[in-house]
Amino acid sequence: MSTTKKDDYYHVGLTDDEVLQSREKNGINLLTPPKRPSLWKLYLEKFEDPVVRVLLVAAVFSLIISIIENEYAETIGIIAAILLATGIGFFFEYDASKKFDLLNAVNEETLVKVIRNGRVQEIPRKDIVVGDIVILETGEEIPADGELLEAISLQVNESNLTGEPVINKTTVEADFDEEATYASNLVMRGTTVVDGHGTMRVLHVGDATEIGKVARQSTEDNLEPTPLNIQLTKLANLIGKIGFTVAGLAFLIFFVKDVLLFFDFGSLNGWHEWLPVFERTLKYFMMAVTLIVVAVPEGLPMSVTLSLALNMRRMLSTNNLVRKMHACETMGAITVICTDKTGTLTQNLMQVHEPNFYGIKNGSVLSDDDISTLIAEGISANSTAFLEEAATGEKPKGVGNPTEVALLLWLNKQGKNYLELREKAQILDQLTFSTERKFMATLVDSPLIGKKILYIKGAPEIVLGKCKEVVLDGRRVDAVEYRSTVEAQLLGYQNMAMRTLGFAFKIVGENEPNDCTELVSANDLNFLGVVAISDPIRPDVPAAVAKCQSAGIGIKIVTGDTPGTATEIARQIGLWNPETDTERNRITGVAFAELSDEEALDRVMDLKIMSRARPTDKQRLVQLLQQKGAVVAVTGDGTNDAPALNHAQVGLSMGTGTSVAKEASDITLLDDSFNSIGTAVMWGRSLYKNIQRFIVFQLTINFVALLIVLLGSVIGTELPLTVTQMLWVNLIMDTFAALALASIPPSETVMLEKPRRSTDFIISKAMQSNILGVGSIFLIVLLGMIYYFDHSTEGMDIHNLTIFFTFFVMLQFWNLFNARVFGTTDSAFKGLSKSYGMELIVLAILAGQFLIVQFGGAVFRTEPLNWQTWLLIIGVSSTVLWVGELIRLVQRIIHKKNRNEK
């Protein structure tokens, strides 16, 4: 802490004792970080997956049988599946969390000037207490909530809290802005002083500040289930019902046939005569449990987790830092995006859109003529902003009022050195901008003409009203006569949501006073022209908005800006159509708050713009949209966005956003690009389709395996597939398949579809037909093999069982190629040469099956096959692929014919 000499401040500030008392009573100036779940709790959360829960039930039943039979391979396999699925999910979320913490690091040691014991001191921001007198200067972040004691031309950037980039602050009650979100004499932690200076008395610190309250709201638990979780719950329930129903029926049939009707219970005496009854009952009970275990797709939770994890990593390469794994897929289900304006749709960077100086030839390009030189000196001297020195190749940045920075940047592009012009022009008097005057004036001793010049800039209508003449190219006209022309220009700019400034000058005689106020009041200035300044939309936003709209996603702008500005931005990005949209499609935050829930529910889906919105308005909008069945994503970079970011199904923060916003989000857009949202939607939709493809592949296996075990037991043959063989098919091979299907790159075509409904079951009718159709064909072929082997000379010996097992695996192997293009008419070989992951996985499955057959022995109940048998199995089983190719070829021909007819 550093202390300066005693200054002539009339504020004494707190004493050391008062500081300690205030800190003890009101706490320190730190925001409580969101409570992080312990690693153990984070891991246990993975067990909330519905399919994992079904696996847990299966593991319990399997363990019972393992204890009875003293054979634990099945149980170990199921437990391994559970641990792998949960472990992978845990690792990737923990890894993302660590990356996020590094991204989101904040420094609470920033020094702040305060008055204590009558002296100006610099202390760390975290040491500020309620009652402290804080000195506010241009460019500084306000460290706590406070009440202004002094405000000299004070302007504050509240865009990260209210969405408003520049707010005028004052202690004069008559000048308060009644429409402002916060009173004009209050300043809030996290906002920035962009112009002027002042002092404030701290009212709230830490969590009691507005930003602290928003941070708390943003970390409240949001138990809204994800769309994928809802679908997997339905699937788990279906699988559980089918498994338990089939197992129950099988047990009942065998128990009645081979126990109730077989034994004469009246003649049984003693426990030794009842023993065969118990043994046979236990045998059929174990068969029932085996059916349940076979019905459960052990590879499904791992495949979903792998798909999410792979997409999590790959989305990072497209500037989407995914913090919560479920957000990868949920992005594909969103139906509404609620977006902030400032910094999300716009660049949050004021820039000169159109200079219109009437005295130079084309009005927008400065040259070396006298008027251009006057304009350059006026902009340079009549300003309090600065440009920071930029590194080679980088654009210069400014410090101070964003509007003045925009003017200096424009001057810089014109090849004028503002600093050199400012230093040469000796300032004699200056009136800083104020809301009362609505202009700024500076009197300089100009080296350009060796005379005094008064420069003025401000609200065009005010500046023009103080002018006698308007400077045109080569002539001057009466200001009153030219007013209508200027007003027409201003109206055009205002309709485009632009800020406008008027510029004027006056050459001051030697005998005239060096008093700006007196000189301006003479109303004999020369009007130079107007400049339109905009916060431009991001170049990629209109295309990104169109992309989302074509994908059936509704977009709603929620901003603290005025209705006019918000509407114009909406028009520029293609969201607002003046010919078709009405007042029903836009509303202010105040009007929205006055609506009852019933009235608001009636309007939320139609709304496109909410202006003058407060954090609570945005949060309520999200919750009402969810009540209407919408899947909502919220974008934002400010602290004001945090509650809505947290309560939405997917919160999307900007990489340059506030720490509170990023903490509340699920995905951080590292490049701050709205376009990345469209990319994330494409990834999410493609991921969902890849999961559906895996389900088609997986459930076909389970459907066939379930009926093979059931019918095999009915026929009375030896179990055609062993536990270890099913583990290879259901766990290891499925993991390879999951990797293959998850690595399919996203397709742009998914953005031409409408969002899926949250009520739609993950297994579509097309999937059902494929699973039942293909599965039935596989079943008939495999039952035919069982019948053939049963009636052959060798019977179902190890050799024939090995052939059966290998043929079963190869059927699934070739079906993997069909699953890869399920839902399309593409050939299974399309893009295969570029898909190195798929090629490696195909080789891994073939190599794994070869090693199991040739060297598995008693563990896998196999014996080596000769190369002729291998070729025969591969050739015959590949019919699955060729039939699929033929069907897709016919579909392509039909589609092409239909397109030509249209």
Model-derived segments and spans:
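Transmembrane alpha-helix entry/boundary detector in multi-pass membrane proteins
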Residues: 797-801
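HAD-like small-molecule phosphatases
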Residues: 765, 769
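Generic alpha-helical transmembrane segments
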Residues: 733, 737, 778-779, 802-817
